[in-house]
């Protein structure tokens, strides 16, 4: 049994990550507006913002940037992929997400995760080893706050009993909460307990593993007393660079991704990321679609506008052709 959403086999909706780390030391709001307008015009359905407090490179704040670009986003669904309720605190994060949902007319997916960076926890003064129990409680508190539930949560780490944040989100009872997980058994059980959807990570999985995770998630949902279908999911943070030049591929892996992710180049070469010629990118993304992926969110590296256009013009048609979309 597998989670499903009633869509045609291989049908994929595309999302674009905001280039929060691609703007160097001088971020430009006009450049970001142009990026979002381009993504909307090219037919991307989702606009995504990741989240870190500190990072190895300059990082624009995700929720703030997403809010600043609502006016350019048309009818795109906005998604945090994912925000950090433990690091930010569930009340502070709920307040920000409620504002984004309200101002966008109810277009937000509240993607949340515990985060994998000890540095984020250190600057927030929170023990990294406590992230799992804190996350379980923080997600329940966040949902109660977004839903306007005055009973809230009273636990070991957070107390939101009697707290009602206003104004409320536009979507009722609240924006859907998708839980991020790399696909461990414990992580998928957490998705099944707390999530309205699952966010997978493109640089922490393969098509084969993703297919297995969908099957395990279906079991976890059943064990949690929830239906396996429909249960939405997406593969986020698919680093993208379409180039015909082998040197361009190596440059992206060695000079951009390896130091940014603190991973060996050899490990990155083994991942099925859409980096390389259009045919290679399409083949790798098609494999995820064949494994059951229904939404894939790409993060263009390099010249972001050119990469968005190149992806839409050269890669997407090949994926569609492969699956008869």
Residue ranges and their predicted role:
Residues 1-325:
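Active-site-adjacent structural elements that line small-molecule/cofactor binding pockets in enzymes
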């Amino acid at each position: 049994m597998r989670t499903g959403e009633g869509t045609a086999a291989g049908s994929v909706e595309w999302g674009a990550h905001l280039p929060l780390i691609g703007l160097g030391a001088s971020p430009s709001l006009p450049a970001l507006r142009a990026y979002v307008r381009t993504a909307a015009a090219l037919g991307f359905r989702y606009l995504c913002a990741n989240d870190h407090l500190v990072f190895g490179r300059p990082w624009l704040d995700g929720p703030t940037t997403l809010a600043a670009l609502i006016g350019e986003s048309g009818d795109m669904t906005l998604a945090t992929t994912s925000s950090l309720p433990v690091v930010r605190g569930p009340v502070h994060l709920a307040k920000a997400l409620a504002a984004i949902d309200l101002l966008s007319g109810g277009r937000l997916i509240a993607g949340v995760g515990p985060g994998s960076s000890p540095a984020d926890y250190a600057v927030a003064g929170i023990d990294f080893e406590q992230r799992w129990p804190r996350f379980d409680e923080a997600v329940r508190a966040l949902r109660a706050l977004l839903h306007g539930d005055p009973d809230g949560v009273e636990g070991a780490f957070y107390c939101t009993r009697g707290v009602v944040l206003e104004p409320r989100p536009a979507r009722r009872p609240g924006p859907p909460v998708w839980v991020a997980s790399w696909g461990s058994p414990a992580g998928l059980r957490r998705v099944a307990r707390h999530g309205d959807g699952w966010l997978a990570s493109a640089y922490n999985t393969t098509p084969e593993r993703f297919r297995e995770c969908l099957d395990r998630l279906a079991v976890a949902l059943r064990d949690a007393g929830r239906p396996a279908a429909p249960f939405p999911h997406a593969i986020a943070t698919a680093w993208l660079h379409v180039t015909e030049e082998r040197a361009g591929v190596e440059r992206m892996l060695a000079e951009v991704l390896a130091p940014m992710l603190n991973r060996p180049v050899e490990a990155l070469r083994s991942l099925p990321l859409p980096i390389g010629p259009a045919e290679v990118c399409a083949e790798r993304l098609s494999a995820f679609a064949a494994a059951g992926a229904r939404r894939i969110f790409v993060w263009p590296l390099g010249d972001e506008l050119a990469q968005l256009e190149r992806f839409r013009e050269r890669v997407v048609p090949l994926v569609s052709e492969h699956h008869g979309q």
